[in-house]
Amino acid sequence: MADEALFLLLHNEMVSGVYKSAEQGEVENGRCITKLENMGFRVGQGLIERFTKDTARFKDELDIMKFICKDFWTTVFKKQIDNLRTNHQGIYVLQDNKFRLLTQMSAGKQYLEHASKYLAFTCGLIRGGLSNLGIKSIVTAEVSSMPACKFQVMIQKL
């Protein structure tokens, strides 16, 4: 429980620190979001390397996504992804109905615009993990009602 609280506090301070140290132009053109996503990317690479060192090779892309949704998500956020959908053409949607990094925020509509800065790190986390498993991807997040969110993973074919 204590490690969970520390992760939430660290994440909030990280977001706050990036936005406080930014100049006005950086906030407006999305550089803060990019910084947070790049931090998540590096952390995701490191975590996946550590989590998969003793596991067998994955058969395919779907197996990798299942690993992300079950094992990886459980280790980082203490629960599995609630729903994984795919069109079997390289697009996956991961839905978390009670995303831990958004549960501390109020559920009002006025807070939806601020949700993106709290999701950027996680988008990078997913992208970094997939990158270390040999999958190049684009990860975006969407929130329609707090604290539920959807992460869309678009696999880029080489």
Curated annotation (Swiss-Prot):
UniProt keyword list: Disease variant, Endoplasmic reticulum, Epilepsy, Golgi apparatus, Intellectual disability, Neurogenesis
Tissue: Both isoforms are expressed ubiquitously (at transcript level), isoform 1 being the most predominant. Expressed in the fetal brain and different regions of the adult brain and spinal cord.
Region forming the signal peptide: none
Listed SUPFAM superfamilies: Ligand-binding domain in the NO signalling and Golgi transport
Tree of life domain: Eukaryota
Any GO CC annotation of this UniProt entry: trans-Golgi network
Localisation per UniProt entry: Golgi apparatus, cis-Golgi network; Endoplasmic reticulum
Biological processes, Gene Ontology terms: endoplasmic reticulum to Golgi vesicle-mediated transport; nervous system development; vesicle coating; vesicle tethering
InterPro entries with a match to the protein in the record: NO_sig/Golgi_transp_ligand-bd, TRAPP_component, TRAPPC6/Trs33
Family: Belongs to the TRAPP small subunits family. BET3 subfamily.
Assembly description: Homodimer. Part of a TRAPP complex. Heterodimer with TRAPPC3. The heterodimer TRAPPC6B-TRAPPC3 interacts with TRAPPC1 likely providing a core for TRAPP complex formation.
Function per UniProt: Component of a transport protein particle (TRAPP) complex that may function in specific stages of inter-organelle traffic. Specifically involved in the early development of neural circuitry, likely by controlling the frequency and amplitude of intracellular calcium transients implicated in the regulation of neuron differentiation and survival.
Disease linkage: Neurodevelopmental disorder with microcephaly, epilepsy, and brain atrophy: An autosomal recessive neurodevelopmental disorder characterized by microcephaly, global developmental delay, hypotonia, intellectual disability, autistic features such as poor social interaction, language impairment and repetitive automatism behaviors, and generalized tonic-clonic seizures. Brain imaging shows cortical atrophy, thin corpus callosum, and cerebellar and brainstem atrophy.
Name of the molecule in the record: Trafficking protein particle complex subunit 6B
Organism name: Homo sapiens
Gene expressing this chain: TRAPPC6B
